[in-house]
């Protein structure tokens, strides 16, 4: 029985990895474990270059880094350049070693728990109904994912409200409000069905700014693996004036007979339509996070490594935020997105299409730096402060995210104002300006603020966004979230196992479309290994994002005080999120499940997986 890549095999694969100067991944028996990147000591005090009496040493260090830490071609699709060079390769290897160390206990638990889960369902006689999927979770996975699946995720998996509100929580990066001034209605829906479901017409919903679209039609270009199937769904959602809820209106498959489903269809037809959409959405979330958080934060930091002295305070902050970041894509290349690897074993589309998605989405959607600022992105998609439609009654991603974002920004503002007493001082920082120039030049960061930057506000925005990507945005789509919400079976399979229907009606059993016992446990165990439960006891949660002595002691008392306030704020937010309960309508944040995906006391401060 092969539930997962064994710990020994994974460790061997990673220990054999080397990134050559040309960026190709190859095998090597040499394992470099340098104690320091370049031999320069870790600073105890930070200083700007214009205030440093040993500027020559700074320049020597920067030149050495530029010579030995270089750009090499992207891996896992054509996204951002990766880290190479003699020292750069050592950094990657060092971070991979730490990553393997963190993975090992989780993988041990997941392997043991996966076998127990599989035995439990086999003892039951297999998956005979949709309710049987609960057996795969009950009493299992407490080691790898101590919190288990989100309350309400299984008991309410047929709920239309749950399906709709996941677009505003567990994967909030797809849905957008249709703008009646510039968009068109993407597909037609039977008028009688629309009136029955909404009390109005499709055109009226559109013109009032109450119609929303989540579009995965691009996946029609992808070819599923043998024995796997997928649609390429578009889904329409609407604001229901009668109930005050955000609800689904229709799902269009865009393959085969190109059927349009609505909640008025036979229950099995409609549930299958939601499952088909989720197959597309699950694929999107996992690869989008790679191109949006990993690829973007890595290249911004790599440009900083090559232009900032280790004595520069911004360098110190970035290295905290980018803890073990360069382990992920390099390891994923050999153990997750390799041909026949873990991704191929579970998802409808192979690693080839994961790479295609990353390549296609990085330059236009996932990778642009400024366009993906937290509030800017939500405004651009009409989800925040839209002038052409009513406010969303509930938006959990924004409700939780805004509090965390504001706290991060407040700390960063103090940090920047402490370093730079005026905008003029910032403009005179040659290393900082070199970083901005490098990011726009050799690093090829998409949509980065142009050089030079002239205000502290611009730097605050840059650093806040990096912190948001590494410590929050990443974990909404990855880390423990796929196990607890966005990958919970039976509603969220990684693939269909029967063809997309060519006609409606006559479906008596949805099990043929869903993974069998073995494939279900493989999916669950893969997602369990994304979690990192030990970060709580290791003080590596978001609450501790800035709590590192070298950074705090080297930048002044105001920064220490700002960190104390940040930790208090994160503690308050964590308590609020972790103690959520259902209200008297059986809802939490307007949803029939309890979402804790942004709990600062549980999620890492860094790009963990």
State each model region's role.
Residues 1-21:
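Fungal secretory targeting signals
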């Amino acid at each position: 029985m092969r539930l997962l890549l064994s710990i020994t095999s994974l460790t061997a694969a990673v220990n054999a990895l080397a990134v050559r100067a040309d960026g190709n991944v190859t095998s090597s028996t040499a394992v470099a474990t340098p104690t320091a990147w370049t031999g320069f000591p870790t600073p105890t005090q930070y200083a700007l270059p214009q205030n440093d009496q040993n500027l020559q040493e700074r320049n020597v260090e920067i030149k050495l880094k530029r010579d030995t830490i270089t750009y090499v071609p992207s891996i896992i699709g054509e996204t951002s350049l990766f880290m190479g060079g003699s020292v750069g390769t050592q950094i990657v290897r060092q971070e991979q070693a730490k990553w393997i160390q963190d993975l090992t206990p989780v993988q041990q638990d997941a392997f043991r728990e996966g076998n127990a889960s599989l035995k439990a369902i086999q003892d039951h006689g297999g998956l005979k109904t949709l309710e049987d999927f609960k057996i795969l979770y009950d009493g299992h996975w407490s080691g790898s994912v101590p919190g288990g699946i989100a309350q309400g995720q299984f008991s309410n998996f047929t709920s239309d409200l749950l399906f709709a509100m996941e677009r505003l929580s567990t994967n909030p990066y797809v849905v957008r409000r249709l703008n009646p001034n510039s968009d068109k209605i993407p597909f037609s829906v039977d008028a009688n069905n629309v009136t029955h479901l909404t009390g109005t017409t499709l055109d009226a919903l559109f013109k009032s700014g109450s119609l929303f679209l989540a579009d995965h039609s691009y996946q029609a270009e992808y070819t599923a693996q043998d024995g796997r199937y997928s649609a390429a769904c578009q889904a329409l959602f609407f604001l229901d004036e009668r109930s005050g809820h955000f609800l689904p209106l229709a799902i269009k498959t865009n393959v085969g007979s190109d059927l349009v489903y609505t909640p008025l269809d036979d229950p099995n037809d409609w549930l299958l339509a939601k499952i088909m959409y989720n197959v597309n959405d699950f694929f999107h979330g996992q690869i989008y996070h790679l191109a949006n958080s990993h690829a973007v934060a890595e290249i911004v930091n790599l440009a900083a490594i090559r232009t900032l002295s280790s004595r520069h305070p911004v360098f110190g902050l970035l290295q905290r935020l980018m803890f073990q970041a360069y382990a992920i894509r390099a390891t994923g290349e050999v153990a997750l997105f390799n041909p026949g690897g873990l991704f191929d074993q579970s998802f409808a589309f192979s690693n080839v299409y994961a790479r295609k998605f990353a390549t296609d989405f990085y330059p236009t959607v996932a990778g642009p730096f400024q366009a993906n600022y937290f509030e800017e992105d939500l405004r651009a998609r009409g989800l925040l402060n839209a002038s052409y439609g009513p406010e969303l009654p509930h938006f959990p991603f924004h409700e939780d995210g805004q509090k965390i974002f504001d706290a991060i920004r407040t700390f960063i503002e103090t940090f920047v104002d402490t370093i730079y007493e005026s905008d003029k001082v910032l403009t005179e920082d040659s290393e900082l300006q070199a970083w901005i120039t490098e990011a726009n030049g050799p690093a090829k960061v998409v949509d980065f603020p142009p050089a030079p930057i002239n205000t502290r506000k611009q730097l605050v925005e840059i650093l806040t966004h990096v912190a948001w990507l590494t410590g929050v945005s990443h974990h909404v789509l990855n880390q423990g979230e796929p196990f607890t919400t966005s990958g919970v079976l039976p509603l969220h399979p990684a693939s269909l196992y029967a063809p997309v229907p060519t006609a409606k009606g006559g479906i008596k059993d949805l099990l043929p479309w869903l993974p069998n016992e073995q494939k279900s446990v493989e999916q669950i165990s893969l997602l369990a290994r994304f979690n990192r439960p030990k970060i709580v006891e290791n003080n590596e949660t978001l609450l501790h994002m800035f709590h590192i002595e070298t950074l705090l002691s080297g930048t002044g008392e105001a920064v220490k005080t700002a960190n104390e306030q940040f930790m208090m704020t994160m503690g308050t937010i964590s308590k609020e999120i972790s103690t959520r309960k259902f209200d008297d309508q059986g809802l939490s944040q307007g949803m029939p499940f309890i979402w804790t995906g942004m709990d600062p006391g549980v999620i890492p401060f860094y790009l963990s997986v």
